[in-house]
Amino acid sequence: NASFVEEKTHPLFALRVRDFRLYWLALVTQVVGQHMFAFTLGWLTFEITGSQAQLGLVHLCGFVPQFALTLLGGVLADRIDARRLIGAAQANAAIAMILVGAVTLLGVAQLWHLALGAFLWGLSAAIDEPARASFFPRLLPRPLLRSAVPLISMAFGSSRVIAPSIAGFLIAAAGAPATFLVCAAAVSTMVAVLFLVHPAHSAARPHESLLNSFTESLRYIRANEAFARVIGVALLNATLAMGFIHMLPVFAKDVLQVDSRGLGILAAAAGVGSLAGFISYSWLQTRLTPRNLIVGALTVYNAALIGLAFSEWYWLSFCAILVAGLGHGYFVTGAQVILQTLVEDHYRGRVMSVFALVWSLMFLSGFLLNVAGEWAGPRLALAGGAAIVLAYVWLSLVRAKTLKKLVLVPKPG
């Protein structure tokens, strides 16, 4: 009945499972460290160079390994113990953060140091994202996936609330080097927790060539129109709009004229909105069809970004970012619920690695929007990208018959 379905999809239901609860707490800590690192790296880059284009270049260096290797990470996640992949990725991320912190502490930080730090972090994320997406479903019964996925999204949303504020105040109080070291400690937490959980056994699969394994997953996605539509619009939105978070240093300094604390509050607004979306998603998914939820979320998100682009007032910008975060929370969670619920286990790592390109494309988006902003101004760059996504959503996505009829029934393992 309806009350039973609502209980099973409530995020807190999955936290009753010990292993998933431990993993989720470690994930929150890890992602806080990651967002703090990205925030601090962007702030330091703009502080040292004062160049919007060079800020975009650092983001591009984080994007390249993620975009190039995330799909490989998905193939590896379907054939290697995901726990090993996650542990190795987070150890590498911690080393990168320590190295950037060290050169900053010594006062010798240059643009190439920051670009290298972004590259190493992107390399870690390329392996970590699909491995995590393949790993956490093995920590709890399959019927609880619709409860667990919003919690995973909530981990990212809560970190976006906490991380920018922590980073902004740490930078002001203790400096960037101390902030980088705190980031390294945070991401290392996941490595320790991996030894405390006991995931379900993952059945061995034939080890065909990497290329065949990858092309097989693309055929699988293409054969499922719902997957193709959801992943396609997610990648478009990531490329043209999600990089707005990497433009905030420019809006904060040049348009709104605030310091690192003010920038931290603006960045946190996106997290507050996303967190509100993640928390209320379980209620919303029982009242809207998956298609209507995704279309509505993308509309709210991109309309809010257009509002942000032309805002002259700090608190109006704050509200626009807050609303954008809400739309982002609904969309990302809804898309992942569709994919994680319907995908078959032996394709999970590869399918989710294609979706994980969303996060690496944020760096490309940051690069494109910042370069376009240098040429046409940040307002037109941001509004133009959001307008293109809105046009696609209403001219194409709303007409997709497969999404109209979509019912979320889990595939057997």
Which sequence ranges carry the predicted segments?
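Transmembrane alpha-helix termini and helix-breaking/packing motifs in multi-pass membrane transporters
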Residues: G42-I48, G101-L106, I162-V182, D254-V255, ...
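Membrane-interacting alpha-helical segments
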Residues: L12, L211-A223
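Hydrophobic/aromatic positions within or immediately flanking transmembrane alpha-helices
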Residues: W24, G56-H59, I86-G87, A115, ...
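Helix-breaking motifs and short loop linkers at transmembrane-helix boundaries and internal kinks
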Residues: T49, D81, V103-T104, V108, ...
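Helix-loop boundary and gating motifs at the non-cytosolic
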Residues: E6-P65, A223-A268
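Substrate-agnostic recognition of the 12-TM MFS/MFS-like secondary transporter fold
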Residues: R21-A38, C61-V75, D81-A96, H113-A172, ...
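C-terminal transmembrane bundle of multi-pass solute transporters/carriers
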Residues: A68-L72, R79, R83-L85, I95, ...
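Helix-loop junctions on the cytosolic side of multi-pass membrane transporters
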Residues: S134, R138, F180, A184-S209, ...
